[in-house]
């Protein structure tokens, strides 16, 4: 089965329609409240902001969490979006140890939150790596929660499970365990679903994994950031679209994407706090 999946991934770009390259649009990521987030109330975050004006954030996920350069490395969904024939999820995973870029969307979120909430101090710790399963991220999550108190956890996951066609039930159980661990640690959780990719949508059955994320987002203190729907909306409405970006603009497009995601994620968190 894994051999067949790798073959499908390799030929995936050939199954997609021919795309015309375009420059980065003037308004790459217009803001829309509709469909950006689902469920949840970040009560712990809100209370922390009222009493201390300081937010400790743990971001756990794939290479994307470390910034544009890491997300463009061979073997990622972003590189596949640009036509790479490399299997985006290698048979073995790799935990990254370098510090995240200031352009990474979790740090861009922090930057925007400081603007939205004057006087706020935000510290972000990023953990994760390329090709990690949710179960591997859960181990990182447990380790970090035991070592330090965080107010907010951002957990980006689901792509590897979908590409490998792993049991959605096990994925959902892993998410539930992680959400409970975050709650027990006195923090709130924002889940982040896979990024939009025509390649990924063509070669994977994403729905069961989206459903698992949605179900867990109904738990207390959990929200779902609908990155996939957000990016698809931008692509369909003439906004940023990695798969149709001119080769000369690709690096700039990924930097722009991280800034857009950070801005929208900050708006989602801030609106929940005020709600």
Which residues fall in each region the model found?
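Extracytoplasmic/secreted envelope proteins and their assembly/folding machinery
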Residues: 42, 106, 110, 138-142, ...
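Second-shell loop/turn segments in exported
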Residues: 64-71, 91-100, 131, 161-168, ...
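N-terminal secretory targeting modules
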Residues: 1-60, 64-98, 118-120, 253-275
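Catalytic His-Asp segment of secreted/periplasmic serine-dependent ester chemistry enzymes
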Residues: 197-275
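Loop/turn elements at helix/coil->beta-strand transitions in domains of secreted/extracellular proteins
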Residues: 53-56, 120-122, 148-153, 184-190, ...
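Residue-level recognition of beta-strand->loop/alpha-helix junctions
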Residues: 126-128, 193-194, 226-229
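Oxyanion-hole/transition-state-stabilizing segment in secreted/luminal serine hydrolases
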Residues: 58-60, 65-74, 111, 115-120, ...
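Active-site segments of SGNH/GDSL-like serine hydrolases
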Residues: 156-159, 179-211
């Amino acid at each position: 089965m894994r051999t067949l999946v790798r073959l499908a991934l390799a030929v995936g770009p050939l199954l997609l329609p021919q795309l015309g390259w375009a420059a980065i649009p003037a308004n790459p990521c217009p803001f829309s409240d509709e469909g950006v987030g689902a469920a949840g109330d970040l009560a712990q975050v809100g209370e922390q902001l009222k009493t201390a004006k300081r937010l400790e954030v743990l971001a756990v996920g794939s290479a994307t969490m470390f910034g544009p350069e890491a997300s463009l490395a061979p073997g990622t969904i972003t590189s596949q979006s640009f036509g790479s024939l490399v299997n985006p999820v290698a048979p073995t995973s790799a935990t990254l140890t370098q510090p995240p870029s200031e352009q990474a969307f979790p740090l861009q979120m922090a930057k925007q939150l400081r603007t939205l909430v004057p006087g706020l101090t935000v510290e972000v710790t990023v953990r994760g790596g390329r090709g990690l399963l949710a179960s591997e991220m859960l181990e990182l999550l447990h380790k970090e929660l035991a070592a330090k108190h965080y107010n907010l956890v951002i957990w980006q996951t689901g792509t590897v499970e979908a590409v490998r066609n792993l049991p959605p039930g096990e994925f959902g159980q892993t998410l539930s365990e992680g959400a409970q661990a975050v709650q027990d640690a006195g923090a709130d959780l924002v889940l982040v679903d896979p990024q939009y990719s025509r390649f990924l949508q063509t070669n994977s059955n994403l729905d069961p994994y989206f459903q698992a994320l949605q179900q867990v987002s109904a738990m207390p203190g959990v929200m779902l950031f609908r990155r996939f729907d957000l990016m698809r909306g931008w692509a369909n409405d003439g906004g940023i679209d990695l798969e149709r970006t001119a080769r000369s603009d690709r690096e700039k497009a990924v930097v722009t994407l991280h800034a857009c995601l950070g801005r929208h994620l900050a708006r989602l968190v801030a609106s929940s706090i005020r709600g």
